[in-house]
Amino acid sequence: TLSIMNSYHIPEFHREWIELGLLEPMDWNINILQSPEYFRIDVLPEVMKQEVLALYSEHINWLEDKDRFKRAINGFKSAMNYMTGTDNSSLIPDLIKNLDKLDNLRKENFFEIFPELQRIKEHG
């Protein structure tokens, strides 16, 4: 399931599994998280959306001659359209509040585990 947490890493994960022979390129279906809303990829601030778009575009280019049914390619394109179709960055304060709650319960620090998402706090 594609969420804010793994949005930067899904292409790398997909490619690694293909290269390891664990997965055929077209045997990939992206399920876009809908709830809770504050974990959705359309919550990312615009600058971070552009970074994710670049990663997905690069991955799609790599997949072009490998995904004969275009199933994975269409999934990544769909995720890109979903992410850019709506600006829900107004939910960033809810995201941070809920991450803080989870961090307190788990005795963890979300932004240490996902440092690439640290900049979200600047937009909350």
Predicted regions and their residues:
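Conserved C-terminal portion of the radical SAM core fold
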Residues: 1-124
